[in-house]
């Protein structure tokens, strides 16, 4: 007959008296030999937790006398305990028959009714019914002898259970539930693998961080007849809840029945599954092994309490959207490939796990969450400015610019799972960090991956996919020519480079730039058969840029031979010929001649965006003249009559001719083009500068309402809207900049973030210099501030600071070629203190544009002395811009911080750049590159 022994300050139990209501009292039974009781003698009695018996309605285990009742059901289960070859196999047999509840007996035999059925380990290969509880007293080793810090002589049971059982009476509510939970141990695990999360009072094992105390658990109880549930298979036991611990809040507290003591084992109805939200249940029955998972993975996943990280509403909405948009999400091949187990797992060759199971969200054995546990939902960090690599191929055009999630379940959605073979892509610049080659070779549909975290609006705009036409070479996709489709434009990324990274791709023919049309109209074509014959030895990589006459009809550009209809590029009427360098009608020809010779000062009554067509071309002469100038009409174009037809076409199509991406050297003279300006003779423009002219952004409007009186908030809001549009323009311009895409992606991000303010104020100075001769600040055609409006604004001192730039342009008489080269150098004028990842490529690119600036100076300055003086003046202006822009950064950051009080709106992408980079710049965490010492 076993006795109930008191422990610590508790009162001793009197035989024959009522049972002690203390929870956690030790039960002393006859010891039994076990594999985990190496140094435990027969006199040492294990301690186990007791079930509180002071309340009615609790589940009592079977009596310890005699054999099992005939109506009870015994279940046996084998599990593997051979973990990493360190331990031998062991079988655990436990009777888990459902015991019906009955009221407690009021006699001395009541003690027998509270004894639990303990697991009696047997030899391998044996399976027998469980003996009575009074005969099996082998204790459970919670953590097993595998703890390295435990001395081998001390039993693991005593070291682990003693701190769990030595609780003060005042903490019964917190410890009773944990002690009761230790009574119901997971079946299918060997004692050495029964890893239970430590409570707040238990010591942690080595290497495991401290975690909050687990929630109380309620143990699932079968029906009285002991029948098993038919749908109980699976690793997640269909939401059966458990509660571990004392005062549980929320659904955990509701799961405990009223009649159960605090921390006791309560009954939870099987149909009430609403309490099972994020927890894994423990069941008193055998759980079948989940398909596609090994026994070890199943047991470890089913019975370890996993604190799943809660997902916010945005992540849940993204997951729902991904499931809804997946067309193949019906358990077919799409679902099988998306949820395939890892190749390194023991069950890689088994059936895929169920869709509802998320094994990658669990903590690994070292209790640390995986870095890529939630690959589909993006980063939990604040939005960072990341630039993704642009997808290649025609299928990238179907991707939405604003989508950050893959539209369906694909093998790349979960980076832990095996990825399908990626398609071959054209070679790109080699990454400077190891392990990034696989990221750049990811398929177009896998834009969201663990190596490239999701980014912001700037990321989506910077390298969004463009419609791509097939390339000529081994990476060429199928042809995409369609009848009446015009022509296909190829991305700029396909252009060759003279750098070492592009030398390997010289065998594949390069692609073309998109036609840089004006006002949406294509440029004129040209005949290049003669020029192509002369470039056989000089430009072998660039021969596909030059089209023979036979290809003129297939080109989307116009040419005189294959022009289906001669259309005026100004008004759309039938063109009578090439007048002043542009294919126009007779009306626009006469209008342009009279307007330029008469020096009329036309003003638009609208917003400088009037429609100029055949019917309305006479409504607004200002917009008509502006369109003529934008199309390239110049009075000097009459000198074309002195040349033959081939040279005329070459000169007219200079902008439309694609230029090499690589920086040309001095020997590349054949690719130079002729340009003309009024009052000047023909001059040669270096090809790179000519390319910079062709990629210059169009006119950007601020959208300011000039009909209303100016207020501080309205002016600042309009300037912010203009800054957002100009930032987008800077991003697109940098994409087309030769040599910029050879830099590392992070370097491209950094350079844009550090220089966007300098580029904007430099463009403001150029527009003010060209349009109003530096007398006003020409922010946009619809936002021009004269001195009176500057004084009325709240940022008059800032306007005076910005006004210095156009005044310097007027003083130095800066040419357009010089301005374009200086603008690129501004982009490359500020780097981080630690340098860039592709520092070598950056220095080569910067040196090349410095040489281009010297060439631009040589177009106007003759002589070494004058050219050197001019170079000093222009570079000194670039150095002085650092201090000027710093004042703009400080004012912009202060306005951004007080934007709510000032009623000033900041657009999204501009806000991201200001919040992420301006504090670093103002704190001196950047390194300005100066031409001259101060």
From Swiss-Prot:
Zinc finger (NR C4-type) residue numbers: 568-588, 604-628
Region of interest: Disordered: 1-49, 61-239, 331-375, 415-454
Numbered residues of crosslink Glycyl lysine isopeptide (Lys-Gly) (interchain with G-Cter in ubiquitin): 388
Post-translational modification remark: Phosphorylated on multiple serine sites. Several of these sites are hormone-dependent. Phosphorylation on Ser-294 is highly hormone-dependent and modulates ubiquitination and sumoylation on Lys-388. Phosphorylation on Ser-345 also requires induction by hormone. Basal phosphorylation on Ser-81, Ser-162, Ser-190 and Ser-400 is increased in response to progesterone and can be phosphorylated in vitro by the CDK2-A1 complex. Increased levels of phosphorylation on Ser-400 also in the presence of EGF, heregulin, IGF, PMA and FBS. Sumoylation is hormone-dependent and represses transcriptional activity. Sumoylation on all three sites is enhanced by PIAS3. Desumoylated by SENP1. Sumoylation on Lys-388, the main site of sumoylation, is repressed by ubiquitination on the same site, and modulated by phosphorylation at Ser-294.
Cross-link (Glycyl lysine isopeptide (Lys-Gly) (interchain with G-Cter in SUMO)): 388, 532
Positions occupied by motif LXXL motif 1: 55-59
Name under which the protein is recorded: Progesterone receptor
